[in-house]
Amino acid sequence: MSRIGKQPIAIPSGVDVSVANSVLKFKKGNNTKELDTKGHVDVKVENGHIVFSPKGDDRQSRAYWGTYRALANNIVTGLTSGFTRQLEINGVGYKAAAKGKILELTLGFSHLINYELPSGVEASVDKNIITIKGDDKQVVGQVAAQVRGFRPPEPYKGKGVKYVEERIIRKAGKTSKK
């Protein structure tokens, strides 16, 4: 039995939820999101909560039960408070600047990296910290992973782009012969 799937999702004020043909529609202001459950789970909106239940008793239905509940919860959280990821830049001459929808990175290459942010995602830079904000958890995480991928942290000096909460396991360098 899914421990995640059986928990109902409380619908916060200001968020409208409707179900039609196994498609959940979330609306807050002019922001609209959809989640297609493809008929794998039954979805009901009752007295301020979204309740999920498996369509059948097979393993596949029970797996989708918790997955779709988690995806719906991420949409509700994204519409109400949003998601953020923070990246830290370490290294001599490594810089970042947010210019509208473009994140400009100087990471020790011979060229500048201009990363175009997808719609619904914003980036801000404060000294060596890049903050990525958005209402879609998957997209925010994807953007953060792609920016980190330009220059992942190396284990000897710790130079590169890393998540703020990430801990780099350091290695000892070569020892010299005497």
Swiss-Prot record:
Q: What is the lineage of its organism?
A: Bacteria, Pseudomonadati, Campylobacterota, Epsilonproteobacteria, Campylobacterales
Name its species: Campylobacter curvus (strain 525.92)
Which keywords fit this entry according to its UniProt record? Answer: Ribonucleoprotein, Ribosomal protein, RNA-binding, rRNA-binding
Coiled-coil stretches noted in the UniProt entry, renumbered to this chain: none
Record's function text: This protein binds to the 23S rRNA, and is important in its secondary structure. It is located near the subunit interface in the base of the L7/L12 stalk, and near the tRNA binding site of the peptidyltransferase center.
Family, similarity comment: Belongs to the universal ribosomal protein uL6 family.
Q: Which domain of life is it from?
A: Bacteria
Record's GO cellular component terms: cytosolic large ribosomal subunit
Which Cys pairs does UniProt list as disulfide-bonded? none
Task: Show the GO MF annotations.
Answer: rRNA binding; structural constituent of ribosome
Please give the subunit comment from the record: Part of the 50S ribosomal subunit.
List the InterPro entries hit by this protein, alphabetically: Ribosomal_uL6-like, Ribosomal_uL6-like_a/b-dom_sf, Ribosomal_uL6_a/b-dom, Ribosomal_uL6_bac-type, Ribosomal_uL6_CS
* Annotated protein name in UniProt: Large ribosomal subunit protein uL6
Does the record's keyword annotation contain ATP-binding? no
Q: Does the keyword Ribosomal protein apply?
A: yes
Q: From its record, what is one biological process in GO terms?
A: cytoplasmic translation
PANTHER family recorded:
60S/50S RIBOSOMAL PROTEIN L6/L9, LARGE RIBOSOMAL SUBUNIT PROTEIN UL6M
